[in-house]
Amino acid sequence: NGWNENKNFILLGAVTWAILVFIVGSLNSYVI
């Protein structure tokens, strides 16, 4: 049960980072 929660947390973190990187990349390309 603990492993399942940890895996979900890691997956959520990966998705969050992917979205942040995408937003930052879009802002940089827009500014430049």
Curated annotation (Swiss-Prot):
Organism domain of life: Eukaryota
Topology term for the membrane: Multi-pass membrane protein
Any one annotated GO CC term: chloroplast thylakoid membrane
Transmembrane segments: 9-31
Keywords: Chloroplast, Membrane, Photosynthesis, Photosystem II, Plastid, Reaction center, Thylakoid, Transmembrane, Transmembrane helix
GO BP: photosynthesis; photosystem II stabilization
Subcellular location: Plastid, Chloroplast thylakoid membrane
InterPro entries linked: PSII_PsbZ, PSII_PsbZ_sf
Described function: May control the interaction of photosystem II (PSII) cores with the light-harvesting antenna, regulates electron flow through the 2 photosystem reaction centers. PSII is a light-driven water plastoquinone oxidoreductase, using light energy to abstract electrons from H(2)O, generating a proton gradient subsequently used for ATP formation.
Assembly and binders: PSII is composed of 1 copy each of membrane proteins PsbA, PsbB, PsbC, PsbD, PsbE, PsbF, PsbH, PsbI, PsbJ, PsbK, PsbL, PsbM, PsbT, PsbY, PsbZ, Psb30/Ycf12, at least 3 peripheral proteins of the oxygen-evolving complex and a large number of cofactors. It forms dimeric complexes.
Family (UniProt): Belongs to the PsbZ family.
Protein name as it appears in the record: Photosystem II reaction center protein Z
Organism taxonomic ancestry: Eukaryota, Discoba, Euglenozoa, Euglenida, Spirocuta
